């Protein structure tokens, strides 16, 4: 690869949207655009409007936004960018988009790529509750890509928090740990992640 084509991350941005009243929260498109603006500020140079490629992680909080890539591009003034949305809001979606962007840069197909994603589950739940007289929905469990009838779903395994404990218990059992030992080890690992975060 020619050194001029080496993909480099020049800016990163993150938005935590927790207004006192959840109804005042931002939607996923606004969160994505704001995160990219924060990344542009981190980069210290104007890049967004010149983006050649925008990769967006599919969001589920607002099902009426089927594909957030075009509204994000419009919010940034990136009229000529190739738009891509991940195939599902999976845990590996951001890294798959980052890999795709890096490969396109390395191949000389594009120069500026933007990767973004956002969820507004708290806001979506509050708005649904306000519209339905107090019944708060569960956007994760109600998402159309999860409401499929299959083996896992028939046993109540719908969202990551249903499945991850199975992995942890299988690992614990294979290591010959008691429940208390397994929980202590998980606690140590996650506390270190929290320190870094």
Please annotate each region the language model reported:
Residues 1-88, 102-107, 114-197:
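Conserved "HGTGT" condensation-loop signature of ketosynthase/thiolase-family condensing enzymes
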Residues 93-96, 108-114:
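Elongated alpha-helical scaffolds
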Residues 95-103:
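Conserved phosphate-binding catalytic cores of ATP/NTP-utilizing and phosphoryl-transfer enzymes
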């Amino acid at each position: 690869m020619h050194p001029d084509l080496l993909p480099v991350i020049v800016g990163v941005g993150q938005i935590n949207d927790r207004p006192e009243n959840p109804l005042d929260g931002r939607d996923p498109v606004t969160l994505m655009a704001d995160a990219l603006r924060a990344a542009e500020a981190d980069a210290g140079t104007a890049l967004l409007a010149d983006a050649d490629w925008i990769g967006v992680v599919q969001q589920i909080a607002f099902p009426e936004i089927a594909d957030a890539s075009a509204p994000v591009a419009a919010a940034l003034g990136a009229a000529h960018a190739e738009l891509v949305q991940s195939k599902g809001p999976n845990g590996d979606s951001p890294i798959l988009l980052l890999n795709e962007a890096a490969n396109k840069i390395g191949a000389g197909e594009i120069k500026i790529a933007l990767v973004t994603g956002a969820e507004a589950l708290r806001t979506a739940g509050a708005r649904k509750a306000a519209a339905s007289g107090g019944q708060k929905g569960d956007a994760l469990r109600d998402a159309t890509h999860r409401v499929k009838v299959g083996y896992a779903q028939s046993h109540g395994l719908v969202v990551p928090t249903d499945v991850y404990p199975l992995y942890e218990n299988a690992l614990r059992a294979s290591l010959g740990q008691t429940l208390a030992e397994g929980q202590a080890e998980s606690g140590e690992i996650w506390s270190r992640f929290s320190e870094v975060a």
